[in-house]
Amino acid sequence: MGQKSNPIGLRLKIINTWDSLWYANKDYTTKLHEDFLLRKFIKKAFYHASISKVVIARKVDVIMVNVYSAKPGVIIGKKGADIDKVKQKIVKMINNNIELNIIEVKKPELKAILIAENIAQQLERRVSFRRAMKRSVQSCLKIGAKGIKVSCAGRLGGAEIARTEWYKEGSVPLHTFRANIDYGFSEAKTIYGIIGVKVWVYLGETKSSNE
């Protein structure tokens, strides 16, 4: 089960929490769709800002959006000009007041989604997939990860037949619910087709949120 399930979803309410913090009755689907559009828009608008996650909380008259980024300066811009433009676009899009907070990610080398996106960007620049995987793994372990596993699937190196290549160092206990495992997925759009990149990062055991 641990091998096939999303490690983040599998550990919800054990050691992980949801990225959407609100409750609704009749208009649940509308708000869920708004969250989806918000995340998609922010990710696209700040593609190079290394965004690890977007947490959305709702109050009666305002939507609070916390953007976790390794490069907050890219989002804020000079004197906050860029972030103000984005706020205006979001307000027009969802027709609601918004409070946008930018939170800096201290160790981006340990964030699985950022590692996956970094590898995908290297593959798009035609860097060897083995070199990209190995470089990311070594960087992650150097910062303090207990283990990491990386998978690249597709027409690797322009091969005729698609295949999956793995690279793993350290321990990645997917079946242990106490294990704090971060998971990320990204796609590299190359001239040979799309290459899927998956990353699992083991950060050590942690106490359950119920304890």
Curated annotation (Swiss-Prot):
Ranges for domain KH type-2: 38-106
Q: Which family does it belong to?
A: Belongs to the universal ribosomal protein uS3 family.
Q: What is the lineage of its organism?
A: Bacteria, Pseudomonadati, Pseudomonadota, Alphaproteobacteria, Rickettsiales
Free-text function comment from the UniProt entry: Binds the lower part of the 30S subunit head. Binds mRNA in the 70S ribosome, positioning it for translation.
InterPro entries with a match to the protein in the record: KH_dom, KH_dom-like_a/b, KH_dom_type_2, KH_sf_prok-type, Ribosomal_S3_C_sf, Ribosomal_uS3_bac-typ, Ribosomal_uS3_C, Ribosomal_uS3_CS
> GO cellular component annotations, sorted alphabetically?
cytosolic small ribosomal subunit
Q: Which UniProt keywords apply?
A: Ribonucleoprotein, Ribosomal protein, RNA-binding, rRNA-binding
Instruction: Enumerate the GO terms in the molecular function aspect.
Output: mRNA binding; rRNA binding; structural constituent of ribosome
Q: Which GO terms describe its biological process?
A: translation
Q: How does it assemble?
A: Part of the 30S ribosomal subunit. Forms a tight complex with proteins S10 and S14.
What is the name of the protein in this document? Small ribosomal subunit protein uS3
Q: Which superkingdom, per the lineage?
A: Bacteria
